[in-house]
Regions:
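Conserved N-terminal catalytic core of the sugar/cofactor nucleotidyltransferase
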Residues: 1-8, 16, 30-108, 112-117, ...
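Residues at the starts of beta-strands that form the adenosine-phosphate
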Residues: 5, 52-55, 128-130, 153, ...
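Short alpha-helical oligomerization interface
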Residues: 22-27
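Conserved beta-strand scaffold positions in the cores of enzyme catalytic domains, especially
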Residues: 28, 76-78, 129-132, 181-183
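Catalytic-core segments of class I nucleotidyltransferases/pyrophosphorylases
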Residues: 103-104, 111-126, 136-207
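A structural motif detector for beta-strand N-caps
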Residues: 213-224, 229-231, 235-246, 250-252, ...
Length: 280
């Protein structure tokens, strides 16, 4: 469809990721040395959805950082209330911008790799509701789980109030009850990066294709032992880093061992032991 618009939901606090998100919004947490927001905008661009007339991003927590990071690539809806508006309320606040168009909605914390997003929109008439789904728990929809993207018709979006509400109860379940919900299987790897464990798993999956599973950003200084890790731009690694992430500019001292963890500043560390079922 030529008139589809897109919304990146990026207003959340990222509470499950704290302390990683104490000073950095979830949307700007890097996966494979790329901020989640940039990943979301790139996957929309792969569908031909670009620019502030076609793509919107909502923001609430540390909104000034999100606005600065968008850099004019999308329309920004800044929510100013005491709490974020949620997945449905965020769309309600964008009704005037959406203005009658069907909308592709993607969560900023969705990590999608190695698969195609295009089937979500293929042969879509813009009237039904579609969910991208993947195998694995929690089995929310016919034994599958939501995979971070949905395609919604205007007739359902126009009813959404600009108040804290979620899409599960206001759109998806009503569409399911009406027999209007279509599930589209994602043929790649999907992770919800909202926890430290899944955030680490996404990073290591992104690094797996690099030599030795080492993804090292520009300007990083690495004199220590690094295996299966992501090292951010300008980071300094003198100790041992294994199955771990070192954020841009962060430091790992010679006497340190960073294993199954995220180093998010000079000394701040979050441990995140991986589950056996984490993708490789």
């Amino acid at each position: 469809m030529s008139d589809v618009c897109a919304v990146v939901l990026a207003a959340g606090e990222g509470r499950r990721l704290r302390p990683l998100t104490d000073r950095t919004p979830k949307a700007l947490c890097p996966v494979g040395n790329v901020p989640l927001l940039d990943m979301a905008l790139d996957r929309l661009a792969s569908l031909g959805l670009t620019g502030p007339d076609t793509v919107a991003v909502n923001a609430w927590y540390l909104a000034d950082q999100v606005v600065a990071a968008v850099r004019g690539r999308a329309h920004v809806s800044v929510e100013s209330g005491p709490a974020p508006l949620g997945t449905a309320g965020g769309l309600g606040a964008l009704r005037d911008w959406i203005d009658g168009r069907p909308v592709l909605v993607t969560n900023v914390d969705a990590y999608l790799a190695g698969g195609r997003l295009a089937p979500l929109l293929e042969d879509w008439d813009g009237d039904g509701t579609r969910l991208l789904v993947a195998a694995g728990p929690p089995a929310e929809f016919s034994g599958r789980r939501f995979a971070g993207c949905s395609a919604l018709p205007w007739r359902r979006v126009r009813q959404l109030p600009a108040e804290p509400t979620d899409l599960v109860r206001t759109v998806w379940r009503p569409a399911e009850a009406a027999g209007e919900l279509t599930l589209v299987d994602y043929d790649g790897v999907y992770l919800d990066t909202g926890t430290a464990e899944s955030y680490l798993a996404a990073n290591l999956h992104a690094a797996a294709a690099a030599p030795g599973g080492r993804l090292i950003g520009p300007g990083a200084t690495v004199t220590g032992r690094v295996n299966h890790a992501v090292i951010g731009a300008g980071a300094t690694v003198a100790g041992r880093v294994e199955r771990a992430v070192v954020w841009p500019g962060a430091i790992v001292r010679p006497d340190e061992q960073l294993v199954d963890a995220v180093r998010y500043d000079a000394g701040g560390t979050v441990t995140a032991a991986l589950n056996e079922g984490a993708p490789e």
